[in-house]
Amino acid sequence: AEKGNGAYLNQRRIHVSEISNLWQSYVFYCEGGEKDRLRTGSILSKVYPEVIDLRKLGSAGLETAWVAAGKGEAYFTTRIEPWDVAPGVLLVQEAGGEVTDFVGNPWKLETSDLLFSNGGVHATMLNLLW
């Protein structure tokens, strides 16, 4: 991905999915360590009944790439470091998706709770994250 020039996989342009209903969505997640397990568990208990499935791959790079390529509709993470997600922010945005904090503010380096999505499910996901 290059800012302003789209996102590509093997020289083919990629795009986020067009799904706009959460109940048709796959959602990836990652908790920011042991301190956030209860908080993440609380979020998962709200999200899981609303989606096809929750997935945890263990790699912010892989999870954001899957959202960018339309293989999932959203990814949320708590207490993550900027170097773990900065490439994924660009990738998802260039593929047509959205990246915000859990309130809906745009990503900044100091943002540690993040939601990446295809845009179509973003508002619904934000409502579930709080």
Predicted segments — roles?
Residues A1-E2, L109:
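Generic beta-strand structural signal
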